[in-house]
Curated annotation (Swiss-Prot):
Zn(2+) 1 binds at residues 146, 149, 199, 202. It comes from Proteus mirabilis (strain HI4320). The gene is dnaJ. GO terms for biological process: chaperone cofactor-dependent protein refolding; DNA replication; protein refolding; response to heat. InterPro entries: DnaJ (IPR012724), DnaJ_C (IPR002939), DnaJ_domain (IPR001623), DnaJ_domain_CS (IPR018253), HSP40/DnaJ_pept-bd (IPR008971), HSP_DnaJ_Cys-rich_dom (IPR001305), HSP_DnaJ_Cys-rich_dom_sf (IPR036410), J_dom_sf (IPR036869). Its cofactor is Zn(2+). This is Chaperone protein DnaJ. It is found in: Cytoplasm. The lineage of its organism: Bacteria, Pseudomonadati, Pseudomonadota, Gammaproteobacteria, Enterobacterales.
Length: 378
């Protein structure tokens, strides 16, 4: 048979104070006491029910547990009940943590109002912005401290009061078999204080939703994957607790000329046939402007030239990377008649006596092909 609600047994509401509980118990105990109702089994049963209800509701800790868990708080040995050493439906992690805390003199401290959440903002940068550094304004949605209650969560002119259940401790003690354990107070949720008259603007939270604008200084040399932390610029904490942090996640967009690898920059520089063969001087782009690059004679496609200190300044040290220029020899197109004649003359000169000296890689390749086919026919 299911047990009746203890408040119902004593004819009380759940907001009844200690005096009302004691008064109700005395009145009902006198009415159903076995000495006044000898032989009446029904009165005896009711008296036991009244006594059990009073033992729980007159004890602040037991009452708090009953308000949170109901009769389950006292089943299987909870609060020293006879029989096994069960935990009455309470959370195992809380129980074991608090048992060992009590044994070794620790125990849980009063929970503080929750710190504000951290926020993340994804910021896209051009390569130039990332290399040189920049200050950017961002606008983010967040929770800020309520300006009406100044973060307290309480109505103007009032303040949070000490919790009457745990008397400000934030914890209630429960007896589990041979052990006394602690659990967060069900009334104040471990904070030790309750807000009876909440602020009309934030409804007791101490925070309100709004957008805020921030200036973020991006240091020179950042790269994709870098993260910048702005301490205290996250969401405001509950009821005056510390704010979280804001993390700006950097992403550098792809550049149409340069590729970045660490602190070095890479680019491809096309050169014409004549410059590659005879050598010369060309202009190449850098992030600081145009610079001259000397191309030696007989330069082949793929040749890499290093320009010291023309890369990216390291964000973590004083070092500066290099600019690596890979030349690509470009085949001439849209030749006029005179140019075609000159190219034909040049080609004939390559095919004549001693022409293999002008194109050693071609000769080496053709010799290799000839040997390959000769080996196949053997």
């Amino acid at each position: 048979m299911a047990k009746r609600d203890f408040y119902e047994v004593l004819g009380l509401s759940k907001t009844a104070d200690e005096k009302e509980i004691k008064r109700a118990y005395k009145r009902l105990a006198m009415k159903y006491h076995p000495d006044r109702n000898q032989g009446d089994k029904d009165s005896e049963s009711k008296f036991k029910e009244i006594k059990e209800a009073y033992e729980v509701l007159s004890d602040p800790q037991k009452r708090a547990a009953y308000d949170q868990y109901g009769h389950a708080a006292f089943e299987q040995g909870g609060f020293g009940g006879q029989g096994g050493g069960g935990f009455g439906g309470a959370d195992f992690s809380d129980i074991f943590g608090d048992v060992f805390g009590d044994i070794f003199g620790g125990g849980r401290r009063q929970q503080r109002a929750a710190r504000g959440s951290d926020l993340q903002y994804n910021m896209d940068l051009t390569l130039e912005e990332a290399v040189r550094g920049i200050t950017k304004e961002i606008r983010i949605p967040t929770l800020e401290t309520c300006d009406k209650c100044h973060g307290s969560g309480a109505k103007e002119g009032t303040s949070a009061e000490t919790c009457s259940t745990c008397h400000g401790a934030g914890q209630v003690h429960l007896r589990q078999g041979f052990f006394t354990v602690q659990q967060p107070c069900p009334t104040c949720h471990g904070r030790g204080k309750v807000i009876k008259e909440p602020c009309s603007k934030c409804h007791g939270d101490g925070r309100v939703e709004r957008y805020k604008t921030l200036s973020v200084k991006i240091p020179a040399g950042v790269d994709t994957g870098d993260r910048i932390r702005l301490s205290g610029e996250g969401e405001a904490g509950e009821q005056g607790a510390p704010a979280g942090d804001l993390y700006v996640q950097v992403h550098v967009r792809q550049h149409h000329i340069f590729e970045r690898d660490g602190n070095n920059l890479y680019c491809e520089v096309p050169i014409n046939f004549a410059v590659a063969a005879l050598g010369g001087e060309i202009e190449v782009p850098t992030l600081d402007g145009r610079v001259k690059l000397k191309i030696p004679a007989e330069t082949q496609t793929g040749k890499m030239f290093r320009m010291k200190g023309k890369g990216v300044k390291s964000v973590r040290s004083h070092g500066v990377g290099d600019l690596m220029c890979r030349v690509v020899v470009e085949t001439p197109v849209k030749l006029n008649e005179k140019q075609k004649q000159l190219m034909e003359q040049l080609g004939e000169s390559f095919g004549g006596k001693g022409g293999e000296k002008n194109t050693p890689r071609s000769k080496s390749f053709l010799d290799g092909v000839k040997k390959f086919f000769d080996d196949l026919t053997k």
